[in-house]
Swiss-Prot record:
Segment forming the signal sequence: none
The keyword Repeat is assigned to this record: yes
Similarity-based family: Belongs to the LAP (LRR and PDZ) protein family.
Any GO BP annotation: establishment or maintenance of cell polarity
Domain of life: Eukaryota
Entry protein name: Protein lap1
Originating gene: Lap1
Lineage: Eukaryota, Metazoa, Ecdysozoa, Arthropoda, Hexapoda
Amino acid sequence: MPLLSKCFPCFKFKREEVIDKLDYSNTPLTDFPEVWQHERTLEELYLSTTRLQALPPQLFYCQGLRVLHVNSNNLESIPQAIGSLRQLQHLDLNRNLIVNVPEEIKSCKHLTHLDLSCNSLQRLPDAITSLISLQELLLNETYLEFLPANFGRLVNLRILELRLNNLMTLPKSMVRLINLQRLDIGGNEFTELPEVVGELKSLRELWIDFNQIRRVSANIGKLRDLQHFEANGNLLDTLPSELSNWRNVEVLSICSNSLEAFPFSVGMLKSLVTFKCESNGLTELPDSISYLEQLEELVLSHNKLIRLPSTIGMLRSLRFLFADDNQLRQLPDELCSCQQLSVLSVANNQLSALPQNIGNLSKMKVLNVVNNYINALPVSMLNLVNLTSMWLSDNQSQPLVPLQYLDASTKTQLTCFMLPQVTFKMNSIQAQQQAQEQYEFVYANQQQPHASPSRRICFAEEATILSNAKAQPAPNYPSFVAAPPTPTPDQMAGSVRLMRSPTPYPKELRQMSKYVRQAQAATSSANASEVREARVVTNGQIHCDSNNANQDVVDQATTSAIYGIAPETTHIYGVYQQPQQMAHPVPTQEYYGLPLVNYEAHYQQLYVEANTPLPTTHLNGDQDYELQPLQQQPMQQQALPTPRLEPPPYHIARVYTKKTPEDLNLYESMRQRKQQQQLQEQTIYQDALNSNSNFKTTAIGAQDVEESVDQLDYQNNISNNLEPNPEEEDQELDDTMSQHSLNSTATNNTSKASHKKSTWIFGVHKNPTVKQVTLKWENSIGFDIAELLNQVGIFVSSITPNTNAARLLNLNDKLLEIDGYDLTNANLSDAKRVLLNCGTVMNIMLSRK
């Protein structure tokens, strides 16, 4: 044949190119490659991260395909033609949008590896259990709630990963998985380790981390071939003693649980190399830990250990020891026998000294003793020739610092400029409070240039300095009351203002902070007055308004926390002087002001007329502190400054600035439903007003119309909220009706000041909130009424749950009127008769505490 092709070139055949592997990974594809041209020879096809939307049917002509990777794409389904790939052994479909698996996949009899992780399966089809050749099955983050009952048919399975699902139990048929070597059920909803796990005797790796497991059954001791056990982030408080049968375990990690002690049998884990048990409640370690001859890494941080056992010196292979954030007071001298120790970290403890023979740890490279009570270092530290980092302070700039002899004559101790360590250590709550106070102080100073000249406390000697009068000896006023003197123009020109800015805001808050400061500067009052003189008077000499007393105490407590004021609250009184540009005269009556502490929060000043001056109080012997009369400014001239608005914390702002589209759609649907509900209620209420208007008297009808207008205005205002809160809406309505009632009362008192005081009609409600509600009922009214002992009127005695009455009424609400019928002087029988005669929609006016 070769001779014939040479003599006759027309008989020369072109040799077919053999291609058995194609790799298009990480290449965006607009069109699917024509891989079917190699359908006879193609065995491996890699299409990872290629933005595929679907698999074409021509792909399945390659019936010799053994490996198919289509992970990290946008596939929404698996074609039914997948069953034609009968030689397929490795199928990777993770990180797609697949919601179901076709039944035809059971035709892939030779499939050994199947990865469906990070898809929205929610349910595993029974066809998967027909793949009896399957050895590796990865179903991580697929929203599974259960496994098929016949899952045990996969007898050849070696690796099973079910991490990050919603599983609560495992099928009992898994006992047949005699070849299973790795089981990962972390991140599920298990509350107890399934009994079937203890029967998987070939298991080598068991991951049960981040569940809610409280107990591990004793049959777990049957896992004699176990090498890796991970149980972090559970609720374990004890471990079974049967774990001593794990003679081959090398890694044991049980961090972030509730363990207080280990069983003595933990020392029987002869092959243990890594032992992690941080973030528990351990108070001590068992002495049997000395039998862990192969242990190289021991992590004990974030526990409650008071001491380390002396037998720890028997750990000859120990290389890493972490015991930070405990309550250790000393380290045992036997620790210096761990010749292989290279990293020792015991920060945030109560150590006062290090072992004298610490120099025997010749392989030591890193030593961390930050935040302890160490005064000096032993002289044997000079023998640590391999030491590369020695951390003595959080503010240490270099890993190593030069050491000197503490006493040149004895030469037994070493020191440096960071020793002795500071003995004062704040707990987490104190540190958080101090950080908050520093932030508020710095932020207040930063905002001061933008604020307008509002009220400030200025003492007598400061006023003298400001007016360039003759200097007088400054009396010893309390330092926490005095405000810094206002600098003169000469002082302003000759000084440079230095200010430390806080940490920059996140990117989302910078523009918000800018607008807040501009709004403050624009809305601050330009005509505000200044306090020229102030005196300090104790609480016992001042009568505070009951409506403002609680808020004043809170503000004063906050001021005390920031500036270190004594616990006893003081009230400050000042003399307000009328600005010269005021066009209206100042009243001549004398007024004493209510307590003024935080002038930015309490910008509305209230005054009560004083009939007699307060007595003079003598403090500190010789010095007199007198309460001076205040002059009230006309209300129309007082600008109401906007309270200082600090930027919200980052974790709150992030919620409002980084919402996902799903969240925004959800909020929009909630808002639309709430608007529709409010419009329906408004329509029902308006119809009820129109139908019942003929039964009301003239006076009551006018009042109802006025109150209904207020209620409709209120409903129109709240309809624009994104996420209305029913409790907040009721509170605002109560405040609106209460304010309307108070205004009406004030008007009547002004016009009829000479009339005799009328009888209080609200019964037990000493500070009532009168409101009108529209109650619609179907099967029953939803509430009962009764008369209270020694009280006049009709009150709500009981409410039926899950009714409109339960949402609108409260117990002990006093009923003033029902559908125009006055109940203030009615008896119980008349009131019940009114309830029986009313329709399915009733208008109720009531008073509430």
